[in-house]
Amino acid sequence: MKVFMGFDPGTKGFVSMIAEDGSFIKAEPIFRDIKVVDMIETANRLLAFVEGYEVRHVVIEDVHALYGSSAKGTFTFGYNSCVPEFFCAIAGLPYTKIP
């Protein structure tokens, strides 16, 4: 089945999938535990998420840290927001970042 994916890498982070006709297929958190990000486990979960589907294109929200956020919070947010882009690169999926 040909599908499209979308990533919202915000505070909680979610990934969703729709069919070519726009019908909803599924959605789930990007990270099992946002406070303890295990990149291997996250990559395996995302690979399982797309298994059996032909992903035509991925849209990733281009998010930015909030003004006045702590350095640690901004660094963590930036780290986590790169995960969807890295996943697409590793999985060979075409993607577009949108504001």
State what each model feature region is.
Residues 1-99:
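Phosphate- and other anionic-substrate recognition elements at nucleic-acid/protein interfaces
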